[in-house]
C-alpha cells in the first residue's frame, strides 16, 4: 500500500456490552441480529450506545493520525427496549442492529428505523461527525505545510 493512506470503519458500540459489537457489527448483524441484540440488552440498566466512526490517516512519512467519534463525542444514544415498530427504513438484514438505536443526544426518542424521513435526514446531516473533524484537521495541516 502506498502513503498517504486513509482507513475508515464504523460500528455500533453498546456500553453494557463493553462496546460490542464495535468492529464486528456486520458479522453481528447477520449472526445475532436485532432480536438478539435486544435479548442481550433485556436486563441491562445502562442502555447507552453510539456509532464509533474511526478514521486513521497515515501520512507520507508513515505517521498515523486517528480520529474516533466515540472518543470525541461519547455515546450519543441508547438501545431501545422494544426495538422498532414502524420500520420506515432499514428493512434488510445488513443494517439490522442499527434499527434499534435511538439518538437521544440529538433529541430523538424513537429508533432510527421509525423516525420520519425529515428527522432522519436532519440527524444524518447535523449529528457530530468524525469526518468533519478529520476534514478540519486535514485543512489545517495543508495550510501549515504551505
What is the meaning of each model-derived region?
Residues 1-146:
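Anionic-ligand binding patches
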